[in-house]
A protein has these predicted regions:
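Alpha-helical cap/lid subdomain in secreted, periplasmic
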Residues: 56-62, 76-221
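Serine-esterase "nucleophile elbow" of acetyl-processing enzymes
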Residues: 1-75, 79-89
Length: 221
């Protein structure tokens, strides 16, 4: 098994791990090879919306998701991601990292994100990769930090000509009391909105016959 992730690890990171770190990984319809497979990568927000995306992609694509508390600067992040990339054939990756990185050194996070994209594209040549912005929070100061990371993420994604799913803009106009259940997380109604927005972002890159549409991906539409 190739250990490509070692080539892309940062030589140093100043970020310390959180008191509790966690990782959740599910592959649905694992034995089915008749439909393309979408990998959703994110954190607890991804853990919240994956079921809504999976429901909407029924009959179009199978879904794997990996939700983790780790920042892309964590030495083990790429190791875990590489294992998931190897597990099943993938057609499209919807990628987010950010809410557990709000206080991470910006230069380190940018370098690690860039290396993460490089590793994915090196590991899976021709894979369709989409950047997803982090969602806003109820705390304005934390939201401002998310905006900073989203701007960096969008710039790095543009370097690779990756399409972007601006989930931040979908959620930011909404009422914090109605659609948030705590500082970070969302109500069932908000998860439905996220699931619909993500599905609409993914669908142009998947056709209804179960084959990814490379021309749509190239256009970024």
């Amino acid at each position: 098994m190739d250990q490509i992730h070692r080539k892309y690890e940062l030589p140093h990171t100043s970020r310390r791990r959180e008191e509790f770190e966690w990782s959740i990984h599910y592959a649905f319809n694992a034995g089915d090879r008749t439909l393309p497979r979408v990998l959703l990568v994110g954190d607890s927000i991804c853990n919240g919306y994956h079921a809504q995306v999976r429901e909407r992609l029924l009959g179009i694509a199978n879904v794997t998701f990996w939700a983790s508390s780790k920042c892309v600067t964590d030495p083990d992040y790429l190791r875990e991601l590489e294992f998931i990339l190897e597990e099943y054939p993938l057609d499209l990756i919807h990628f987010n990292n950010g809410l557990h990185s709000l206080t991470t050194d910006r230069a380190e996070w940018e370098a690690a994100l860039r290396n993460t994209f490089r590793m994915i594209l090196d590991k899976l040549p021709g894979i369709r990769l989409m950047w997803c912005a982090s969602t806003p929070l109820t705390d304005p100061e934390l939201t401002a930090q998310a905006v900073e990371l989203n701007a960096i993420g969008a710039r790095v994604a543009a370097e690779f000509n990756l399409p972007a799913d601006d989930l931040f803009s979908v959620m930011n106009p909404l009422d914090r009391k109605e659609f948030w259940c705590d500082k970070y997380h969302f109500t069932p109604a908000a998860k439905e909105l996220q699931g619909e927005a993500i599905t609409q972002a993914l669908k142009p890159f998947l056709n209804t016959t179960g084959n990814a549409d490379p021309e749509a991906f190239r256009r970024g539409t």
